[in-house]
Amino acid sequence: MQNLNNHYKPDNMSDRIALSFTKFLRFVADIFFKKKYGHRAVVLETIAAVPGMVAGMLIHLKSLRKMEDDKGWIKILLEEAENERMHLMTFIQVAKPTPIERFIIISAQFIFIIMYAIIYLFSQRTAHRIVGYFEEEAVFSYTEYLDELETGRIKDQPAPKIAIDYWNLPLHSTLKD
């Protein structure tokens, strides 16, 4: 596996809060999902789709309230939320969560939406740093997943049709692709 120890070092209290929050969520995911990388990806993408939507909505409301242009941020943030949603739709096809797992995922998303919105309202810097640390954790998790696929500990499988269509992949692409 590649060296994944490089990450943004916390500079201040806001960064330390963001890193601690991210590490706590990673700890919870590790307890629940261990080596079930498909399920971990579903939760990761469920959570990853939230920040762009929340930030886009709050900037939209601020733009309306102040009657000022958003300088294109709403569109960028909502496009990011949509991209993360497509990752989620892909991994739902891979992991095939049970109804109970879906309920847990929806509950986690609901709680995270509220928590992230509160954090964003109090400190946009902390909220954006959380997203940065989430991306670091995503790289770590997906690198582990890819390592499991490449070593054969997890069987590779055909890429879901939704992924092939969304990312214009060749017809016979696999999960590794």
What are these regions (language model features)?
Residues M1-D177:
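Non-heme di-metal
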